[in-house]
């Protein structure tokens, strides 16, 4: 009799994806982030589900419901801060995962890569809408500023913004729909992740050398399950340190003030993981130009496979490309720093130069 693991129609799929999956024998810890992202997603859906049970999506009570959750609900503060800092861990893993793909040429699996870019957009949209829900000052003004950018679209812009707002300003209707979408999107993301994995398992994993490893494969379990568990423990250690010792380190203190449409905070800025894109947006003095640059800064990932001209897939044996890659990383860190600074003399020009360099490296210098 065959093992049920290999004969049962449903368990067979799980077996071929996570247990008997042939994997290259030489993939490094940079390949752990896919599984960590899956764990982050599961964690976010779980904590989010329990948070949604206590949350009210109404402008009058949203802020108080979050406050009530932290004070009155059993371990509500753990749920809330796990969810908020879990989003930060999600983006850390996401950016490292993308960086790994860029460094080792994993983008040559075009379907997997494009699916990943769609996933990135979906996760960013979800995170943005989630940030609006506590209805603090930054939530309200962040939503106002970012949704207002759509008004830069010629001809339909103004109507589009009012359509998204459900009125003439960010108000009750906006909050309600953002909550609905924030609840729905993670499940759509889960489905897209399945497609992402489906495309990946068509080709098999890439490896650090960038050469085919078909002649040297090992089963995923136990080798990589153990390796992933180590990564999981390390991630949970960092997350729990954040949640239990300094849960507000990555947040904005302005968000502890209830939203007030009559009072603008001195510095409106998004969460840290959007600062690089925000800096690119601000570095262009024209509204439409800024919005285009913002969208292109992420959409540019789509064209990377077509810019690949090297005979080697991975950067492992290309020192010059490595220098450029780390220059790109440094540039993104600079942009992240600039995004959090006020719009004043030295920061404006640094942001503009960093934005130009970002696009230059990817389009002109890299290939």
From Swiss-Prot:
Transmembrane domains' residue ranges: 33-53, 77-98, 113-133, 178-198, 226-246, 288-308, 320-340, 347-367
Listed cofactors: heme b
Membrane topology note: Multi-pass membrane protein
Residues where heme b b562 binds: 83, 182
Gene Ontology CC terms, in alphabetical order: mitochondrial inner membrane; respiratory chain complex III
Disulfide bonds: none
Residues that coordinate or bind a ubiquinone: 201
GO biological process: mitochondrial electron transport, ubiquinol to cytochrome c
CDD domains: cytochrome_b_C (cd00290), Cytochrome_b_N (cd00284)
GO MF annotations in UniProt: metal ion binding; ubiquinol-cytochrome-c reductase activity
Major localisation: mitochondrion
Binding site for heme b b566: 97, 196
PROSITE patterns cross-referenced by the UniProt entry: CYTB_CTER, CYTB_NTER
Keywords assigned: Electron transport, Heme, Iron, Membrane, Metal-binding, Mitochondrion, Mitochondrion inner membrane, Respiratory chain, Transmembrane, Transmembrane helix, Transport, Ubiquinone
Domain of life: Eukaryota
Protein task: Component of the ubiquinol-cytochrome c reductase complex (complex III or cytochrome b-c1 complex) that is part of the mitochondrial respiratory chain. The b-c1 complex mediates electron transfer from ubiquinol to cytochrome c. Contributes to the generation of a proton gradient across the mitochondrial membrane that is then used for ATP synthesis.
PANTHER family: CYTOCHROME B (PTHR19271:SF16)
Record's subunit section: The cytochrome bc1 complex contains 11 subunits: 3 respiratory subunits (MT-CYB, CYC1 and UQCRFS1), 2 core proteins (UQCRC1 and UQCRC2) and 6 low-molecular weight proteins (UQCRH/QCR6, UQCRB/QCR7, UQCRQ/QCR8, UQCR10/QCR9, UQCR11/QCR10 and a cleavage product of UQCRFS1). This cytochrome bc1 complex then forms a dimer.
Note: Heme 1 (or BL or b562) is low-potential and absorbs at about 562 nm, and heme 2 (or BH or b566) is high-potential and absorbs at about 566 nm.
Protein name per the record: Cytochrome b
Name of the encoding gene: MT-CYB
């Amino acid at each position: 009799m065959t093992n049920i693991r290999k004969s049962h129609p449903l368990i067979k799929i799980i077996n071929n994806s996570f247990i008997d999956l042939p994997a290259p024998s030489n993939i490094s810890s940079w390949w752990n982030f896919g599984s960590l992202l899956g764990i982050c997603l599961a964690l976010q859906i779980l904590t989010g589900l329990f948070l949604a049970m206590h949350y009210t999506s109404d402008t009058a009570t949203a802020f108080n419901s979050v406050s009530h959750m932290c004070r009155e609900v059993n371990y509500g503060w753990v749920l809330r801060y796990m969810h908020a800092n879990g989003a930060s861990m999600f983006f850390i893993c996401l950016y490292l995962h993308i960086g790994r793909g860029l460094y080792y040429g994993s983008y040559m699996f075009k379907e997997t890569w494009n699916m990943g870019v769609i996933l990135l957009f979906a996760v960013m949209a979800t995170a943005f809408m989630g940030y609006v829900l506590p209805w603090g000052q930054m939530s309200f003004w962040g939503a106002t500023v970012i949704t207002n950018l759509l008004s830069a679209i010629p001809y339909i812009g103004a109507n589009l913004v009012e359509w998204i707002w459900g009125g003439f300003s960010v108000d009750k209707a906006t909050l309600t729909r953002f909550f609905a979408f924030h609840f729905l999107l993670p499940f759509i993301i889960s489905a897209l992740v399945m497609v992402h994995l489906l495309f990946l398992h068509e080709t098999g994993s890439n490896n650090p050398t960038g050469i085919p490893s078909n002649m040297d494969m090992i089963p995923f379990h136990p080798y990589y399950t153990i390796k992933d568990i180590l990564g999981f423990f390390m991630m949970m250690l960092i997350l729990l340190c954040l949640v239990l010792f300094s849960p507000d380190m990555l947040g904005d203190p302005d968000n502890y003030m209830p939203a007030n449409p009559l009072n603008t905070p001195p510095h409106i800025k998004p969460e840290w993981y959007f600062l690089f894109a925000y800096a690119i947006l601000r570095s262009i003095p024209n509204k439409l130009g800024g919005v285009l640059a913002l969208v292109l800064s992420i959409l540019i990932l789509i064209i990377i496979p077509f810019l690949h001209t090297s005979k080697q897939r991975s950067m492992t044996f290309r020192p010059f490309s490595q220098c450029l890659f780390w220059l790109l990383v440094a540039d993104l860190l600079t942009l992240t720093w600039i995004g959090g600074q006020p719009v004043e003399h030295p920061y404006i020009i640094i942001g503009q130069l960093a934005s130009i360099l970002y696009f230059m490296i990817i389009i002109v210098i890299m290939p």
